[in-house]
UniProtKB/Swiss-Prot annotation:
Localisation: Cytoplasm
Species of the source: Thermoanaerobacter sp. (strain X514)
Name under which the protein is recorded: Pantothenate synthetase
Binding site for ATP: 30-37, 147-150, 176, 184-187
Alphabetical GO biological process terms: pantothenate biosynthetic process
Described purpose of this protein according to its UniProt entry: Catalyzes the condensation of pantoate with beta-alanine in an ATP-dependent reaction via a pantoyl-adenylate intermediate.
Length: 283
């Protein structure tokens, strides 16, 4: 496994691999890897011949009062995990390497970034699309794998790729959960034992939504109401939003015809957690 913090190294390595006919797979991460991230690496391995992982806590996607400084980091541990998975290349740049001078060019996807998480984290998705566009230009991957837990991020990146003709296929990977149902997240480390228990309310509320859907309920408001009810039954849970949208366009749904995404964001104590249920689409 090659590890580098230099863009020029990545370019040379990828060029070599492409010349020998290899298909390049990219898994962009912010590090502090968990089983969810590792599942993305496994999916990338299935769809490509050379798997690259980027580890970069991207400052421009954090708001002024968000957790950039305390976001968990452990590169040594991450590298051990990736080595075990048979990853080929790890790119772990410094902020200076990625943003050597004042950043005057950004990539912004309109409209679908203004709802769900975007409504509460202004500028967040602009930071995401800008860094992902940079990574796509650095790696020129054939495929890139993103987790369904960040459902809005996947939709936004897919739109950017479509609109700007990036020659990369975006593969969506299913949410990986702890044995008790909590969606895996690097931010789960912030939860104390009491909050960790309370956080199960997110997946419980989505289970209730799924039950309604399986029983034939198609009215989005009925489902949203039920999810809110379950979430509000947990005193430590402060709901930020519950939405029922189309998974590709993120348009609000009133009636569920085929595909739907039930997306939620809550604070458990001071930790913001997101989760979702994808209905009518197999990934």
């Amino acid at each position: 496994m090659i590890v580098t913090d230099k863009i020029s190294d990545v370019r040379n390595i990828i060029k070599e691999q492409k010349l020998s006919g290899k298909k390049i797979g990219l898994v962009p991460t912010m590090g502090y890897l968990h089983e969810g991230h590792l599942s993305l690496v496994r999916i990338a391995k299935k769809h490509s011949d050379f798997v690259a992982v980027s580890i970069f806590v991207n400052p421009i996607q954090f708001g002024p009062n968000e957790d950039f400084d305390r976001y968990p980091r452990d590169l040594e541990r991450d590298l051990k995990l990736l080595e075990k998975e048979g990853c080929d290349l790890v790119f772990a740049p410094s902020v200076e390497e990625m943003y050597p001078s004042e950043l005057l060019t950004t990539v912004n996807v309109d409209k679908i970034t203004e709802k769900l998480c975007g409504a509460f984290r202004p500028g967040h998705f602009k930071g995401v699309t800008t860094v992902v566009a940079k990574l796509f230009n650095i790696f020129t991957p054939d495929i890139a794998v993103f987790g369904q837990k960040d459902a809005q991020q996947v939709a936004v990146i897919k739109k950017m790729v479509e609109d700007l003709n990036f020659p990369v296929e975006i593969i969506k990977a299913p949410i990986v959960r702890e044995s008790d149902g909590l969606a895996m997240s690097s931010r789960n480390v912030y939860l104390n034992p009491e909050e960790r228990k309370a956080a199960l309310i997110l997946s419980k509320s989505l289970k209730e939504a799924e039950k309604l859907l399986l029983n034939g309920e198609r009215n989005a408001n009925t489902i949203i109401k039920k999810v809110n009810e379950v979430l509000n039954s947990e005193p430590l849970c402060k709901v930020q939003y519950v939405s029922c949208v189309h998974p590709d366009t993120l348009e609000d749904l009133t009636y569920i015809k085929d595909k739907a995404l039930i997306a939620i964001a809550c604070f458990i104590g001071t930790t913001r957690l997101i989760d979702n249920l994808l209905w009518g689409e197999n990934i």
